[in-house]
Regions:
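Long, hydrophobic, well-ordered secondary-structure blocks that form the structural core
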Residues: 1-18
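C-terminal accessory/tail domains of diverse enzymes
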Residues: 14-217
Length: 217
């Protein structure tokens, strides 16, 4: 693929539907672990493409800034008004969500996850789709501890600017927390961690997209 190519994944917002608690859990999960997700969705590269911040910049700060209102939300409309729903070029994009009826399944009603990179490797696509889908499903099924996510956000959250290293370096503690929150089997956890760790290759000071050493069969 071109070193300037990105990859977008659309998943039906109907998974969360009109369940305010499910939306709240998903938004907290994404915000708390966006830095882990970025290194993961670099895919078979160890860093993001040059145009990443134009076409797929981090979204966590935007969501975090509206979290007080999200915590008070009583309806999907309340959720919507605390999100930046017009930010089409964001890593997590809400522009295609049909907030008037988020359970709608007969047309375009999707959450868009915009990957910094593209790939022709089908295993990477499978890992990415599986991860984003399982994030939504685990949020819908309330299998995660929302109080734990609140703690993460109130005690550990750092904005992107000034802390860019969090989106590049390996943070094994956060990665292990994430897989335990999202996946219900060890196979999914292993595939995620392999793609996230990339044999612990670092990308400090690298300005061009670099292919990772082979970490999948």
């Amino acid at each position: 693929t071109s070193h300037n190519a990105g990859g977008h994944i659309h998943i039906g917002a109907s998974i969360l539907g009109e369940d305010v608690e499910a939306w709240r859990c998903f938004l907290k999960l994404y915000t708390a672990y966006e830095n882990v997700l970025f290194r993961f969705i670099y895919g078979d590269k160890i860093n993001g493409r040059k145009e990443m911040f134009k076409y797929a910049p981090p979204s966590a700060d935007l969501i975090y800034n509206g979290m007080s209102g999200i915590n008070k939300a009583k309806s999907i409309s309340d959720i919507k008004w605390n999100l930046q729903t017009n930010e089409r070029y964001a890593a997590l994009n809400f522009c295609n969500v049909y907030f008037k009826d988020p359970g709608y399944i007969y047309g375009k009603n999707t959450l868009e996850f915009r990957s910094p990179n593209a790939t022709t490797n089908e295993v990477i696509w499978q890992n990415n789709i599986n991860t984003f889908a399982k994030m939504l499903l685990s949020s819908r099924d309330k299998v995660m501890d929302e109080d734990f996510l609140d703690y993460k956000l109130s005690h550990e959250y750092l904005p992107y600017l000034g802390n860019e290293y969090l989106y590049n370096n390996v943070n094994l503690k956060n990665a292990l927390e994430f897989v335990d929150l999202v996946f219900d089997n060890n196979v999914d956890k292993i595939y995620f961690l392999r793609q996230y760790l990339k044999n612990f290759q670092e990308n400090y000071g690298i300005e061009t997209v670099v292919k990772a050493k082979k970490f999948i069969k």
